[in-house]
Amino acid sequence: MGTPTIATIVFPARDFEAGVAAWSSVFGTGPTFSSSGQQTPPGEADFAVFKTPDLEIGLTSLPWVDAPLVFIDADDIEQKRRELIDSGATALGEVADGSLAEIGTAPITNGDPETGVVEVPGAKLAVVRLADGNLLGLRQALPVAW
């Protein structure tokens, strides 16, 4: 197994509009993708992405991230997820209020209820809690047919 590539770092943005403005200032341009920026019901994201040649910076107002969350690229997200679980990680999934819960402890409302894997345009995503308590995101790129 080679060294994983860091794909994305997602930051919490409790004040979504202020977060987008701050990161736009950092990059000197607006996000390459952004939801409407309007407050949305629980479980629906205000989300923005800033892309660089090597890394994506994401902002989310959902409660599933309260500290920066690193996503690594995985060629096969299900295999990588299983490997991490076999080494002591815990699979997480998104529940109704937009937060994360251990699979099997609450109904998963976004993604596969058995694995927590979510498909979004261009990627499959999963989050695990590593044995040391830190969260790690996994991302598998998918072809996009626009």
Predicted feature locations:
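A short linear hydrophobic-aromatic micro-motif
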Residues: 32, 57-59, 91-93
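Short acidic/glycine-enriched loop/turn segments that link adjacent beta-strands
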Residues: 40-46, 65-66, 100-101, 120-124
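Short, charged/polar, Gly/Pro-enriched secondary-structure boundary elements
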Residues: 54-58, 133-135
